A protein has these predicted regions:
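Membrane interfacial helix-start motif at the N-side
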Residues: 17-47, 93-107
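Alpha-helical transmembrane segments
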Residues: 45, 112-119, 148-156
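Alpha-helical transmembrane segments and their membrane-interface junctions
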Residues: 110-130, 197-207
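C-terminal halves and exits of single transmembrane alpha-helices
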Residues: 99-123, 185-192
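Membrane-proximal soluble regions of multi-pass membrane proteins
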Residues: 2-23, 74-98, 158-207
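Alpha-helical transmembrane segments of eukaryotic organelle membrane transporters
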Residues: 38, 42-45, 64-75, 105, ...
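Helix-coil boundary and interhelical linker segments in multi-pass alpha-helical membrane proteins
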Residues: 45-60, 116-143
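Hydrophobic alpha-helical membrane-embedded segments
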Residues: 48, 52-77, 150-163
Length: 207
């Protein structure tokens, strides 16, 4: 019983640490934080849609959630030396548990290429019903994007099993699925600070 409790405590402690490291290293920009708030709200909407319109959920999560989220990282997050955490951009990229910028480029390229696959083979080797109109084509695209999202999540999780350990992979998996809830909690005030002209979070290193 004690071992089980210790394992659970270790899991939750690592989840808190992964969340803290992700925030303090990769979310200095108030614009990035605000875009993460938009992304989080989009993903929460997608979670609801998933129960009765899964393909539409994928369209919302990718087109709004992922694009806003990743544009924040690529275009607005500082890439210079991080004096707050005493770490170079290269170091932060190297220690990133999940998808660093390089891995994100690969994932987003795969996502962007899926419409070409659907254009070349509308039924995707017979896995999807041939589209008869624009809505059915978008429905098929949504299912492809679900496959890309689930595949990307499982790929990195299993990769972490071997690069780190099983718990790290499972913690990261849990973190990704619960990030929308946590991001709303963390960044709900970011747009207000941004409207006041604050571009960088001065308290990013404070718990």
């Amino acid at each position: 019983m004690g071992d089980i409790a210790a394992t659970r405590l270790g899991f939750m402690a690592e989840l808190a640490q992964q969340r803290w490291d992700d925030h303090r290293y990769y979310h200095h920009s108030r614009i990035n934080q605000s875009l993460h708030l938009l992304s989080a709200l989009s993903f929460l909407t997608g979670y609801v849609l998933l129960f009765f319109a899964p393909a539409m959920a994928a369209l919302v999560c990718w087109l709004v959630g992922m694009l806003s989220r990743q544009s924040g990282h690529f275009f607005f997050e500082p890439k210079g030396y991080d004096h707050v955490n005493d770490a170079s951009h290269e170091h932060k990229e190297a220690i990133k548990v999940g998808y660093n910028l390089h891995r994100k480029v690969v994932l987003m390229a795969i996502w962007a290429a899926t419409p070409l696959l659907l254009w070349a083979d509308p039924s995707v080797l017979g896995l999807l019903p041939p589209p008869i109109d624009a809505m059915s084509w978008l429905n098929n695209l949504g299912w492809l994007w679900i496959a890309v999202g689930v595949g990307g999540l499982l790929y990195r999780t299993i990769q972490l099993f071997f690069l780190r350990d099983v718990q790290t992979g499972l913690v990261w998996f849990t973190k990704i699925l619960t990030d929308p809830f946590h991001d709303v909690y963390l960044y709900h005030r970011a747009p207000l600070f941004l409207m006041k002209g604050q571009l960088i979070d001065p308290d990013v290193a404070k718990r």
